């Protein structure tokens, strides 16, 4: 028989084993939680309902200084005075001059002092809906965690340039705010979709048709604590969020947040600077348009020599004078000498297991632009230009027919799944691969870092 000492020893070992097992479960759950997306609601700074159409604007990086100057006109409430403040200086003033950043901060203060921008009195999530050509995409406006970006849970698919990062970092620092949101995608989620649709059936806070793009923009405020809890919990189940558009803004916002963490001796992790503003859309709702190429010459080849060279890697079909649009992945449209051609990549020219090599932007860059036309660097070669967004194939035809360009190449749009696959693999998309539309309007909401 076992002695009392033996029994006590067994009981003690069992207790130790049980406690160890429980601690392992707790630690595992904490690790899983830390490896999921973290978001929070925030007190948005927004224009009053009656002023939103005066304040709102296109994002800073889709127009130049003179276009911003023209669009702002005599409207002193235009957000361009904050995001393109060089328009308040004589023509030719560099947008990177120190006085321009200082003007942005002065104008931001002026907007708040004048009541053109007002901070909400409590934390909210928000819903931002955009309707283009009858299709609506619904985004959740959230505070995204800086650490998620720094540790790779917010995934990117483009390279960023340090000079552009520093420009946006200066803008964030001087305003102590994320003036413009970044554009995220997340895997489809039925619970979040149901919640969003419930709000979408109610009257929005904002509802307007934007000038120039002509798209409808609507905005709702989520005040219910239970709904906000659901949103936070559903995002906490997602291992990753994906930057769709705004890689430089994302990097700048996260890097400034990380700076503030480092420089604050009393940092707790609860400060507002630990988060930056993002609008998160379900991946399946997003629209990616084709991003096409026009080239100045055929690298010394005649038209027939160029076509013959293409036939080594593509099935080439003459489509005549009517505009031809690519019909599927790996099908391209060529415009040359007033005629359209269908180019279909032969199956041995790409590897379906390679997330980069299977992309049409990579296939066309390797087999046409590089191998035949000698264009090695899409970012720096002056012989090539890019036509994206809503301009359509008519713009390709116009630029070739005008004599400005020799040929045009149209691509089938990249899919959101391809982008997520590349981001998940830790790789980078080739340059000039994605064009999201519609763009986020700026000025609907701002996130303070205080």
Label every PLM stretch briefly.
Residues 35-450:
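Surface-exposed, charge/polar-rich loops and edge strands
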Residues 17-35:
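Short, Lys/Arg-enriched N-terminal segments with co-localized hydrophobic residues
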């Amino acid at each position: 028989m076992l002695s009392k000492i033996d029994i006590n020893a067994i009981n003690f070992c069992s207790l130790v084993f049980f406690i160890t097992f429980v601690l392992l479960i707790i630690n595992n759950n904490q690790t899983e939680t830390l490896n999921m997306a973290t978001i929070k609601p925030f007190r948005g700074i927004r224009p009053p309902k009656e002023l939103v159409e005066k304040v709102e604007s296109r994002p800073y990086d889709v127009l130049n200084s003179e276009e911003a100057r023209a669009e702002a006109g005599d409207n002193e409430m235009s957000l361009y005075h904050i995001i393109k403040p060089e328009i308040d200086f004589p023509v030719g003033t560099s947008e990177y001059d120190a006085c321009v950043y200082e003007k942005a901060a002065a104008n931001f203060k002026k907007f708040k002092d004048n009541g053109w921008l007002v901070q909400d009195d409590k934390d909210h999530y928000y819903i931002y809906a955009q309707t283009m050509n009858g299709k609506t995409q619904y985004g959740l406006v959230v505070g995204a965690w800086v650490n998620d970006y720094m540790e790779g849970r917010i995934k990117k698919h483009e390279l960023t340039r340090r000079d552009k990062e520093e420009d946006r970092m200066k803008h964030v620092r001087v305003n102590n705010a994320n003036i413009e949101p970044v554009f995220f995608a997340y895997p489809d989620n039925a619970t979040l979709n149901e919640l969003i649709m419930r709000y979408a059936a109610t009257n929005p806070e904002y509802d307007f048709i934007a000038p120039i793009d002509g798209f409808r923009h609507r905005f709702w405020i989520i005040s219910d604590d239970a709904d906000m809890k659901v949103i936070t919990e559903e995002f906490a189940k997602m291992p990753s969020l994906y930057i769709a558009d705004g890689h430089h803004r994302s990097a700048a916002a996260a890097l400034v947040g990380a700076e503030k963490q480092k420089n604050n001796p009393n940092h707790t992790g609860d400060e507002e600077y630990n988060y930056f503003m993002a609008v998160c859309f379900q991946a399946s709702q997003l629209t990616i348009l084709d991003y096409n190429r026009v080239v100045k010459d055929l690298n010394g080849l005649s038209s027939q020599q160029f076509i013959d060279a293409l036939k080594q890697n593509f099935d080439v079909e003459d489509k005549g004078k009517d505009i031809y649009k690519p019909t599927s992945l790996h099908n391209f449209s060529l415009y040359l000498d007033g005629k359209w051609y269908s180019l279909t990549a032969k199956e041995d020219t790409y590897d379906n297991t390679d997330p980069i090599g299977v992309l049409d932007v990579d296939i066309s860059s390797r087999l046409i632009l590089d191998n035949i036309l000698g264009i090695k660097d899409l970012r720096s070669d002056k012989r090539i230009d890019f036509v994206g967004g809503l301009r359509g194939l008519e713009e390709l035809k116009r630029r070739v027919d005008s004599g400005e360009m020799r040929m045009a190449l149209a691509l089938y749009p990249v899919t959101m799944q391809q982008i997520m696959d590349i981001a998940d693999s830790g790789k980078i998309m080739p340059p000039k691969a994605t064009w999201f539309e519609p763009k986020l309007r700026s000025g609907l909401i701002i996130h303070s870092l205080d």
